[in-house]
């Protein structure tokens, strides 16, 4: 039951710095132009070395963030991220030494701009934390009912989740790592989109981790991982509607997926159509997931909430 899930809200200055570097390095629109100016030189030098090493730059930054979120040291996080991005094992130490100082420069520039970040994040996280305490258990209970018809497995919901709060760079963002039972969120003070409250982003990330863990542990059919991930969006939105957090006859699937940086407009339209078609279905969830899988464009692959980083 959802009541067994507790979230520990933790301000995370180190992840904030890494997230800012990631945003600048990947040329993602950034709300803090000053930070963009401060970090562009060191992260560009990091990227240049990554390109020279012929590794997957996007994979490097994603895995680097996951390691920092798990409180791994910068140097070790860098080495592990390089391996995940395809660096030759014999070259990892050399490449790490070449870029870790630049990462350190970016970190120091960020923390100098936000010298009291830990205290600020604690204050910024408070409204969302209070909103989650009010609506979170109800949202997860509603999601569980939709999937399991009032009888979710005992281990469906994670008992403990750590939520790492970071300085907003994109006006609302988040991601998760089911393996470590951790998620991260930009500590925005108000809802970015009133029609899709931020508390629903939290519910979506917690649900995504539950789906990921359960599917990997119980199913050999990993082809259903993608539809499982996509279904998490309307499930959470519909739960929000039950609690009067979402208004209107049509679920704002497209708006939510855009806000959560998950999928594109074509995928969102397909998910919305599938949701409408299966509303009155009595078929088991796996059967309905296969229907969604058949509706998806062939080019879609490897998408999950954990890629929302």
Predicted regions, residues:
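Long, compositionally biased intrinsically disordered regions
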Residues: 277-309
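Long, mid-chain structured domain cores
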Residues: 52-140
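Conserved aromatic-histidine-acidic binding/catalytic patches
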Residues: 116, 124-135, 190-194, 220-228
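Alpha-solenoid helical-repeat scaffolds
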Residues: 93, 111, 115, 175-178, ...
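Auxiliary, metal-adjacent structural segments of Zn-dependent hydrolase domains
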Residues: 112-179, 238, 242-251
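Well-ordered, non-membrane alpha-helical segments in soluble/globular domains
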Residues: 134-144, 199-203, 229-232
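Post-HExxH zinc-binding segment in Zn-dependent metallohydrolases
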Residues: 2-69, 211-283
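Active-site recognition of the HExxH zinc-binding catalytic motif
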Residues: 181-217
């Amino acid at each position: 039951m959802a009541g067994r899930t507790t979230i520990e809200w933790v301000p995370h200055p180190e992840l904030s710095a890494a997230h800012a570097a990631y945003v600048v390095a990947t040329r993602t629109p950034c709300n803090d132009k000053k930070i963009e100016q401060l970090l562009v030189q060191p992260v560009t030098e990091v990227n240049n070395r990554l390109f020279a090493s012929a590794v997957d730059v996007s994979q490097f930054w994603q895995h680097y963030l996951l390691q920092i979120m798990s409180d791994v040291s910068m140097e070790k996080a860098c080495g592990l991220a390089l391996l995940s991005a395809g660096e030759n094992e014999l070259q990892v130490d050399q490449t790490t030494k070449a870029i870790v100082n630049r990462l350190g420069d970016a970190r120091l520039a960020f923390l100098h701009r936000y010298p009291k970040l830990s205290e600020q994040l604690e204050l910024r996280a408070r409204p969302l934390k209070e909103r989650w305490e009010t609506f979170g258990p109800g949202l997860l209970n509603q999601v569980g009912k939709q999937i399991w018809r009032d009888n979710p497995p005992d281990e469906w919901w994670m008992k403990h989740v750590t939520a790492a709060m970071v300085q907003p760079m994109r006006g609302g963002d988040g991601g998760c790592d089911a393996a470590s039972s951790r998620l991260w969120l930009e500590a925005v003070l108000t809802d970015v989109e009133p029609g899709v409250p931020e508390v629903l982003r939290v519910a979506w990330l917690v649900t995504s981790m539950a789906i990921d863990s359960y599917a990997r542990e119980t199913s050999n059919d990993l082809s259903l991982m993608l539809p499982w991930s996509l279904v998490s969006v309307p499930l959470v939105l519909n739960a929000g509607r039950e609690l009067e957090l979402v208004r209107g006859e049509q679920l704002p699937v497209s708006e939510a997926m855009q806000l959560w940086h998950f999928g594109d407009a074509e995928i969102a339209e397909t998910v919305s159509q599938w949701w409408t078609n299966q509303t009155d279905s009595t078929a088991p969830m796996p059967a309905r997931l296969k229907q969604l899988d058949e509706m998806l464009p062939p080019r879609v692959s490897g998408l999950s909430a954990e890629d929302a980083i």
